[in-house]
């Protein structure tokens, strides 16, 4: 059973010390489809005009090249997007402790455990990268802290394409935690021309006796499983005490 919870949305949330401010406009380009048709057509027209009127042809080629650049220039790579979310999480531990109102020595049963991943719900913009990994414009991270009697949870949601962030906290008694596990779910992303493709992803889930739960998609399932094993061992020992 959760014994405390609160949260907020802040459209103008200030960047904490050590974080790099998001370039939202640039990140948006990552999720926008590339359309070179207009630029190519203008370039072809420029080539045709060049034979009769070189100056007009050069102008046409320049305009066509500029239109193509607008589509491909300054577009972030897969690694750029990953770096953006990593930077945003750089101060998560300090942020979490402050929001929970805790000192680190109060939650020292084991080291904090965190899970994080891209959000794949219907409101998110989703793209399959060149590395065959799926990314979206929304991200979520969850961090757990462990005291002698309780598990303190901090959840941080944010967008990489607009200034939108949300924080929330929960506290659970060990005896009320039913399970911690990884599960599989599915989502879909647009492949253009009104078509979509489906994919599966793994997520972490904590469930309590009251039926409440916390879940978060995970980017690295192997690391997540090791963390879950550590949580299970601690929860089991606390219930047996």
Segments from the language model and where they lie:
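N-terminal topogenic membrane-targeting module
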Residues: 17-31, 64-135
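Alpha-helical transmembrane spans
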Residues: 28-78
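Short, surface-exposed charged micro-motifs
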Residues: 141-143
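Canonical phosphoinositide-binding patch of PH/PH-like domains
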Residues: 205-225
């Amino acid at each position: 059973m959760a014994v405390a919870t609160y949260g907020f949305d802040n459209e103008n949330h200030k960047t904490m010390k050590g974080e790099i401010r998001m370039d939202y406009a640039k990140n948006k380009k990552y999720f926008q489809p590339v359309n070179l048709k207009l630029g190519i057509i203008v370039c072809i027209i420029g080539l045709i005009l060049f034979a009769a009127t070189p100056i007009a042809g050069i102008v046409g080629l320049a305009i066509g090249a500029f239109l193509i650049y607008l589509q491909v220039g300054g577009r972030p790579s897969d690694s750029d997007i990953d770096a953006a979310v990593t930077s945003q999480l750089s101060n998560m531990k300090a942020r979490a402790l402050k929001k929970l109102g805790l000192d680190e020595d109060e939650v020292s049963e084991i080291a904090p455990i965190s899970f994080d991943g891209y959000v794949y719900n219907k409101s998110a913009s989703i793209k399959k990268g060149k590395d065959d990994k799926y990314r979206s414009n929304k991200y979520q991270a969850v961090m757990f802290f462990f005291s002698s009697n309780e598990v303190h949870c901090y959840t941080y949601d944010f967008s990489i394409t607009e200034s939108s962030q949300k924080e929330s906290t929960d506290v659970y008694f060990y005896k009320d935690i039913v399970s911690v596990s990884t599960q599989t779910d599915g989502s879909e992303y647009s492949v253009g021309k009104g078509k979509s493709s489906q994919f599966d992803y793994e997520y972490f889930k904590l469930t309590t006796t009251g039926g409440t739960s916390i879940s978060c998609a995970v980017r690295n399932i192997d690391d997540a499983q090791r963390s879950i094993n550590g949580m299970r061992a601690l929860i089991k020992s606390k219930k047996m005490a």
